From Swiss-Prot:
Complexes and interactors: Homodimer.
Cofactor note (record): Binds 1 zinc ion per subunit.
Species whose genome carries this gene: Kosmotoga olearia (strain ATCC BAA-1733 / DSM 21960 / TBF 19.5.1)
Names of required cofactors: Zn(2+)
Family under the similarity heading: Belongs to the class-II aminoacyl-tRNA synthetase family.
EC top class, as a word: ligase
PROSITE patterns: AA_TRNA_LIGASE_II, TGS
Name assigned to this protein: Threonine--tRNA ligase
């Protein structure tokens, strides 16, 4: 049996015998063969050592390829599992799953009565290093389903048996390295000696298959990179991220709390946190107004007839909350779009009324398993800055470009860099392929006309249309998915939305779903970590604290505070019977942007000493000058202090 192989440049290589991608790489260049770690075969990622089909297109995966981590991190997950089995005994260790995740990998274990802690990680790492030095080959093999089940039963691996029984295929794929065998689709590195730089990070609990009705397993997380410098940089970033964890900083600053006993996954915002949310909404409302949007409010609960018609009942029901009254079933809204559609349908629409741009700070509820809840970043109830644009097909491209410009206006004051993903048709899509292709092309044209960097995520669109996801990069280099622009030709069809064109005929509008913050709660959590709690002045819950040096300066401090409050500044007076240094320290811990130190000299000269939270001072400033500049900083939503400070 021969092989006919097409290379990325379109050239063809033919062989009269079976070959692997490693063979092809060696034929092309010995240097290339050394750099290759995997291969893409007809769009799928394969091991280098897997025999190629008779006809195929291949693209070798090199170390710098963004897909490269899929190979070495997956191999690390198997090395981790093998190490755990060697240490704790193959008779005691029951294997769950061990996938690649963003920036790393994990493996789930059932260890019976053995309880892992982070103190166990060094000895597991040591055993992993031994396995790497052994340079064990990873050998892929397939078994018929029944033989695969028998193999896993013989090895006393009940979780693997369950996975095989659920396979739709009649064949199961395994990988062997030394004495270790695991159910796995791959891909992997050729041998354990081909991986180097890793670190085990943490141990946590995880329900089998993410279902809290199942047994709690023990999950070990790890990370791995192609270069030592990349691993070191990531670990440094992770250390910084721990310091910035919004789940610690938020309660410390009195921003929010959670009651997992009474309202799991539902944030409780305290006065200071509510101030920040209101400032974010105020900013958003200003930009919406400039772009021609109209704010609306729609019902929190609507009956099941609406959700059947919208398609959410069939495609999203498992994530919804329900109630029943008067023999009528209702759902708490997981999305705002049906309510906005009802506004569109409330009157006859003409082409002159379009585009109609409706937006809402809508509270939505979506069920999330308890195991995935994560502070403000993964909740069950949250606020969306949700908007829907109803327009003609002729208006579509310009409206999409306007939304992209809107994204830039919102993200710029926070200092975020961002990029876009174009997400295409998923397997469970609604509607016609032709309409999907038209919608996808419209999104692509809009992105390219703006000149925005983007990549394509095949199959990652929503069930009712393709979308653009925006990813922001925070101050320590992490990416967060926030804004979404979603095209929808399906919902107008389902709700029979129409408008009368210039020829007096009825036409179907196009619908654009759009959120910029995304989840306001999640965006808040991201900002806490982005700023490490030290919000710019316009967002800070308390913008200024007046600090009287002693009791005799309290009246002057109140006078200064009242003057600033009259100008709209959020200001407190610290009247505690504590030392000035104590008060300054407390203000710094509370991340208050400005401290006004007020003593005899300031009172007599009717001036103030301005201290920034970083410790820099300006002496003898007139209150009127400070107030004017502060208002300018706040109104322009500046990310840095407007004042020029000198270090003491």
């Amino acid at each position: 049996m021969g092989c006919k192989i097409e290379l990325p440049d379109g050239s063809i290589k033919e062989y009269d015998h079976p070959v692997t991608a490693a063979d092809v790489a060696a034929d092309l260049s010995p240097a290339l063969a050394k750099r290759a770690i995997g291969v893409e075969v007809n769009g799928e990622l394969w091991d280098l050592t897997r025999e190629l089909p008779e006809e195929c297109k291949i693209n070798l995966i090199l170390e710098k390829d963004p897909r490269a981590p899929e190979f070495f991190r997956h191999t690390f997950s198997h090395i981790l599992a093998q190490a755990v089995m060697r240490i704790y005994g193959s008779d005691k260790v029951k294997l769950g799953i061990g996938p690649v995740i963003e920036n790393g990998f994990y493996y789930d274990f059932d260890l019976g009565d053995i309880r892992l802690t982070e103190e166990d990680l060094p000895k597991i790492e040591e055993e992993m290093e031994k396995i790497i030095k052994e340079d064990l080959k990873l050998e892929r093999f397939e078994l018929p389903k029944e033989e695969a089940i028998k193999l896993m039963k013989d090895q006393n691996q009940p979780y693997k048996v369950e996975l095989i029984e659920d396979l739709e295929s009649d064949v199961a794929t395994f990988y062997r390295q030394g004495e270790f065998v695991d159910l796995c689709r791959g891909p992997h590195m050729p041998s354990t000696g081909k991986v180097k730089y890793f670190k085990l990070l943490s141990v946590s609990g995880a329900y089998w298959r993410g279902d809290e009705r199942n047994k709690m397993l023990q999950r070990i997380y790890g990370t791995a990179f192609a270069k030592k410098s990349e691993l070191e940089a990531y670990l440094k970033m992770m250390e910084e991220a721990k310091k910035r964890d919004h789940r610690k900083i938020g309660p410390q600053l009195g921003l929010f709390s959670f009651s997992y006993e009474y309202a799991p996954g539902m944030p409780i915002y305290h006065p200071k946190g509510t101030i920040v949310l209101n400032e974010l909404m105020k900013f958003s409302r200003e930009v919406h107004s400039k772009h021609g949007y109209q704010e609306v409010m729609t019902p929190q609960i609507m009956n099941d007839v609406l959700w059947h018609r919208s398609g959410h009942w069939d495609h999203y029901r498992d994530n919804m909350y329900f109630t029943e009254k008067d023999e009528q079933q209702y759902a708490i809204k997981p999305m705002n779009c049906p309510g906005h559609i009802l506004i569109y349908k409330s009157r006859a629409m003409s082409y002159r009324d379009l585009p109609l741009k409706l937006f809402e700070f809508g509270k939505v509820h979506r069920y999330e398993r308890s195991g995935v809840l994560h502070g403000l970043l993964r909740v069950r109830g949250f606020i969306q800055d949700d908007a829907h644009i109803f327009c003609t097909r002729e208006q579509l491209k310009e409206q999409l470009k306007d939304v992209i410009r809107f994204v830039d206006m919102i993200y710029t004051p926070f200092g975020f860099e961002y990029r876009a993903d174009l997400c295409t048709r998923p397997e469970d899509f609604m509607g016609d392929v032709e309409i999907w292709d038209l919608a996808t092309e419209a999104l692509k044209d809009a992105i390219e006309s703006i000149g925005l960097e983007y990549k394509v995520n095949e199959g990652d669109g929503a069930f009712y249309g393709p979308k653009i996801d925006f990813h922001v990069t925070d101050s320590i280099g992490r990416e967060w998915q926030c804004a979404t622009i979603q095209l929808d030709f399906m919902m107008p069809e389902r709700f029979e939305l129409t408008y009368v064109g210039p020829d007096n005929k009825e036409y179907r509008p196009v619908m654009i779903h759009r959120a910029i913050y995304g989840s306001l709660d999640r965006f808040f959590g991201i900002l806490i970590e982005h700023y490490a709690g030290a919000f710019p002045t316009w967002l800070a819950p308390v913008q200024v604290v007046a600090i009287p040096i002693s009791d005799k300066h309290v009246d002057y401090a109140r006078e200064v505070a009242d003057a600033l409050a009259a100008e709209g500044v959020r200001v407190d007076v610290d009247e505690k019977q504590k030392s000035t240094n104590y008060k300054i320290r407390e203000a710094q811990l509370n991340k208050i942007p400005y401290m006004l130190i007020l003593g005899d000299k300031e009172k007599e000269s009717e001036t103030i000493t301005v201290r920034l939270r970083t410790g820099k001072n300006i002496y003898g400033m007139k209150l009127a000058e400070f107030s004017a500049k502060l208002k300018e900083e706040i109104s322009n939503r500046m990310s840095e202090s407007i004042f020029k400070f000198k270090a003491d």
